[in-house]
A protein has these predicted regions:
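Extracellular beta-strand/beta-solenoid scaffold signature
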Residues: 75-90, 104-123, 133-155, 163-254, ...
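Bacterial N-terminal signal peptides that target proteins for export
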Residues: 1-7
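Juxtamembrane/start-of-transmembrane alpha-helix segments at the extracytoplasmic/lumenal side
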Residues: 559-572
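N-terminal extracellular ligand-recognition/capping segment immediately after the signal peptide
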Residues: 53-86
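C-terminal membrane-anchoring or membrane-association module
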Residues: 572-588
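Extracellular modular ligand-binding repeats in secreted and cell-surface proteins
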Residues: 443, 451, 479-550
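Extracellular/surface-exposed low-complexity segments
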Residues: 23-46, 51, 300, 319-321, ...
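Bacterial N-terminal signal peptides
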Residues: 8-17
Length: 588
């Protein structure tokens, strides 16, 4: 019986030992067609040949870095606590997860010279596919300034439900970036098929002009302590692009292409939300949002081109696209190129401010706005609250009003020889400070600001020149002081016969009144002031009528005393006639 008990205990112990032995197997490799399992991940990596596939069987933390090209499979995580890893091959996470921590507790990589200023010096490719992920986390207080320092032809691929993330800690005031490209030829970042890319908290996000291609995915750079990006080609198809809360530029490109229902959101960046030196192209299905940017020493919503290369860059926003530029602390739209917004683009430029000129739009290139573009409630400290133009602007039928400028040109400021083409004001526009309907364009110059409600500083003068001009003009969409005409219809004693009419219009505009047909009355004469011009004082126009008898009144039988007098006479005559008839009958 005791012996049987010993056998049971031995069997249980052996089972537990075998179970623990199996649990210690952390990875496997195929060797000569057979699967070989390893209890030590460093041993598995060392045994692997270039381009081998290692299947992870558990989460692992290697102690040694490597050069060779490897693919890791299995839904487990491989974690390195290192800095200065020099890698020149192709590393693929196929459903697996790579984490590289370069912060407290990190050790230098052991394959060659290990620079402290980077987590990885990349000369090859990093790829996450099929739900795999790659994460870099670094602390600049520990001397690590870059997550990735990339050499020529280095690429990052994030494909098929994969994720890529760089997290920077304590980066403010420390030169460095999430991704630094030494040379850009052949390098790029490619994010496709329901994948995501995130740089969060780096000093600069990515720099030195890589190609970035995002399709059916999300791409975000946020909370950087300097520029989020720098140059290159950026193309988005059916994707959501976010550049948020960065202390420098948001999306900085050489060429920007947005299509297939993509949304680009650049919000709360210290410099420009979006800036492109060469090209901006947006198709009819996509949306651009660039709000609340430009709170640094430069910046704004969108900038196309550079002041040194006027009309060399090109912008095309297709009909149906939506562009919103709101609440920026500098020019909402700054254009040095040839920028065209097609008809039926939804363009809203509102509530922007600038310490100089052109809070809504500063244009030095050639700019065409769509009909019904909204440019309103923008405030410039100097000139051109709505638009400041020193190039060519076509703003036909744009809703350009209720903007403000500190010195001149609340809505429009056009410098000499610049071309400005615009339209008459619309009858449904009204001023925001008095709620009066806008009736025309008025001069709003530095010497004499438009002012209709202050008698001491009263100045109201309509702009009466061409709506296509190369002259220096400063204009405001506004209204004249309103005059009132009261039209009354009275009899000769001054009694009102019908209700009076009130008419209002701008001072010095013409007015014209008319008489009314009133039963049993006829007009005595047409008043001398039946026509005239509106004045500051109210004008009363009096139409006087006299009463007349109608044909019906002349045919009515007499009444009253006359009728009482004729009744006895009629009766007497009737008696005489009857008496005559009676006498005649007697004789017969």
């Amino acid at each position: 019986m005791k012996r049987k008990g010993y056998f049971i205990i031995l069997a249980v112990s052996l089972f537990m030992f075998l179970g623990n032995a199996e649990a210690l197997e952390v990875a496997s490799l195929m060797k000569d067609g057979k699967e070989v399992k390893y209890e030590d991940i460093d041993e598995a990596i060392l045994s692997a040949q270039d381009k081998d596939i290692i299947t992870l069987l558990s989460d692992v933390s290697p102690t040694k870095t490597f050069y060779k090209s490897l693919t890791f499979k299995g839904n487990f995580t491989i974690t390195y606590n290192v800095y200065g890893w020099r890698y020149k091959s192709d590393l693929t996470l196929d459903g697996s997860h790579l984490v590289i921590n370069s912060k407290e507790g990190m050790k230098k990589a052991d394959n060659g010279e290990a620079p402290t200023w980077a987590s990885m010096v990349l000369g090859g490719n990093l790829t996450a596919i099929n739900g795999g992920s790659i994460t870099f986390s670094y602390d600049s207080n520990k001397g690590v300034m870059n997550a990735i320092y990339a050499d020529n032809k280095a690429t990052i691929n994030v494909i098929d439900n994969a994720k890529f993330k760089i997290e920077g800690l304590n980066t403010s005031g420390k030169a460095g970036q999430g991704i630094q490209l030494d040379m850009t030829a052949g390098s790029g970042i490619f994010v496709k098929n329901n994948s995501s890319f995130l740089i969060d908290g780096a000093n600069r996000g990515y720099v030195n002009s890589p190609t970035v291609y995002v399709e059916n995915s999300n791409f975000t750079v946020q909370n950087c302590t300097a520029n989020a990006s720098n140059g290159g080609l950026f193309e988005a198809k059916n994707s959501k692009i976010n550049f948020l809360n960065n202390a420098g530029h948001g999306l900085s490109t050489g060429i920007l292409k947005v299509s297939n229902n993509s949304v680009v959101n650049a919000t709360n960046n210290a410099y420009y939300g979006i800036t492109s030196t060469n090209e901006i192209t947006v198709d009819d299905s996509s949306t651009i949002i660039s709000n609340e940017n430009g709170y640094g020493f430069i910046g704004g919503g969108i900038r196309l081109g550079t002041s040194g290369k006027l009309n060399k860059s090109v912008g095309n926003i297709a009909s149906g696209a939506k562009v919103t530029l709101k609440g920026n602390k500098s020019n909402a739209l700054e254009n040095y190129g040839q920028f065209k917004f097609a008809e039926n683009v939804s363009l809203e430029i509102t509530e922007n401010k600038d310490k100089s000129n052109g809070a809504g739009i500063f244009n030095a290139g050639t700019l065409t706005l769509p009909s019904k573009a909204i440019v309103q409630n923008n405030h410039a400290d100097n000139y051109g609250g709505g638009i400041y133009n020193k190039g060519t602007v076509n703003a036909i039928n744009s809703a350009l009003y209720n903007n403000h400028a500190g010195k001149a040109g609340d809505d429009i400021y056009n410098v000499t020889d610049a071309l400005f083409n615009f339209s008459k004001t619309s009858i449904d526009w009204n001023l925001d400070d008095c709620d009066h309907l806008i009736d025309d364009w008025y001069l709003d110059t530095e010497e004499k600001r438009y002012n209709v409600h202050d008698e001491e500083n009263y100045f109201v003068q309509k702009y009466d020149k061409a709506l296509e001009t190369r002259e220096n003009i400063a204009l405001k969409a506004a209204h004249n002081l309103l005059g009132k005409v009261i039209v009354k219809y009275v009899d000769e004693e001054g009694n009102e016969l019908i209700s009076s009419i009130e008419m209002t219009g701008s001072l010095d505009d013409n007015y014209e009144t008319e008489s009314k047909e009133i039963p049993n009355y006829e007009l005595v004469s047409i008043p001398l002031n039946s026509k005239g011009v509106y004045q500051k004082e109210d004008i009363t126009v009096m139409y006087v009528y006299k009463k007349v008898s109608s044909v019906f009144e002349e045919q009515i039988p007499p009444t009253g005393e006359n009728f009482k007098l004729s009744y006895p006479i009629f009766a007497l005559i009737s008696l005489i006639v009857l008496a005559g008839v009676f006498i005649l009958k007697k004789r017969i």
